[in-house]
């Protein structure tokens, strides 16, 4: 996916405000996942997950390729058994020989040490869930954990996690410590409750084990299906890491967001809120739809915040009684004609009241000023007035005259 190195507003804009509107991202360490880097000031990375059975080699290869071709930079694959880990090795090799080397994350959950050790040989990153990596048999009669019991289980976790940490460290590979609000370990629930604090403490326990073994190629996630819980958990995690001198990158996502318009709104509400605070280095929009549907949402969020520019930015008014042409129809025509011109800002405004001012940051403007005619702008400068039925054609001619047109 093409990304302009530094998204900015048009250089044609006069009297630029001295107020800095750039999002200041939290400083994090770079974590290499194959040929992609998460954190360290690199562009926010877009991820997704295939929904094929990993034992279906050809289906999984095709699914990974479909995602990667539309801009998914890292792809996650579920690995619930040793057989799936072996299959993923074959998937990886088949991708290399038939397509290209795509960074893969293995998703490992219940009692996952043996699975994780096997799959770590073949892919770039392993995701583990602290609440499920070491099985704690629930005790319905329990009312609390003593400190000794808490620490005893912590030591078992260390013994189970250490081999994976060491093999990832020695191979230069990465780990995501992926906490889920819905699967906190029982002792965390008893000690901290079903809270963002419990999520943070769960992550910190695993981070400290990794650090004690000199492994810091770590990414952290704090996912929840409720946006307020998710936002609070990530903010608390960022604060605790800052207080402790930790600089691990954060993977953002609202888990189980659903589908359709609301699923997209819910994901955006959580992810964009944190990104606007400067929190977040990689994102996944989780939809109950084909994974390919997630990728455009990710890039739209990043573009809207000015964090990555991978498409044309269109500015258009909502239309009102002053509008002098069919705004929805014209915007569609302009978009279809120019959507391949990555990097441009184009404004389509229905009347003169807000047109020139609202589109001041755009490279080109298409404004209704006189019935039957369109005024075309370059930045704030009106270039010419043309008949309405020639508006889109003349806009293209203006872009071509400026040497900014490329054939689709």
UniProtKB/Swiss-Prot annotation:
InterPro entries, per the entry: Dihydropteroate_synth-like_sf (IPR011005), IspG_bac (IPR016425), IspG_bac-typ (IPR004588), NO2/SO3_Rdtase_4Fe4S_sf (IPR045854)
Catalytic activity field: (2E)-4-hydroxy-3-methylbut-2-enyl diphosphate + 2 oxidized [2Fe-2S]-[ferredoxin] + H2O = 2-C-methyl-D-erythritol 2,4-cyclic diphosphate + 2 reduced [2Fe-2S]-[ferredoxin] + H(+)
Cofactor(s), names only, from the UniProt record: [4Fe-4S] cluster
Keyword Oxidoreductase: yes
EC nos: 1.17.7.1
Family the entry assigns: Belongs to the IspG family.
Stated role: Converts 2C-methyl-D-erythritol 2,4-cyclodiphosphate (ME-2,4cPP) into 1-hydroxy-2-methyl-2-(E)-butenyl 4-diphosphate.
Name by which UniProt lists this protein: 4-hydroxy-3-methylbut-2-en-1-yl diphosphate synthase (ferredoxin)
Gene name in the database record: ispG
